[in-house]
Amino acid sequence: MCGGCKWQHIGYETQLQYKQQQVTDTLQRIGKVQMPAVQPILGSPSQTYYRNKLEFTFSFMGWLTEEQIKDETAQYDRRVLGFHTPARFDKIIDINHCWLQPDPSNQIRLAIRDYARENMLRFGNIIKQTGLLRN
């Protein structure tokens, strides 16, 4: 699971409560901001395809899932365009379908990834800061 969907196993109303608490805690504890009474967070009317901005990262060595690692017969193109795994800046999961942003986002991302693969463009190496395509 990528970092984008890390909240999806929790009910939406609970997600909103946690996210509001996270923002409030950050402003008070780190920012030392004296907070007035905070109104409840306004949620999206939709629980999928509600994001208007996402940032994807290219990687020449995509992160494999446990299922992919166990499948010894499969060959995977490790050049990926996706999201960071949770808590890792250097591990990128290839995303075939993202539930956070509406189409044509998925089609555009996949077309760009496939074009880069077909035209042998150099995918980024996050550790070495090399490669034509990064994020």
Please place each PLM-identified region on the residue numbering:
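Accessory RNA-recognition modules of RNA-modification enzymes
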Residues: 1-135
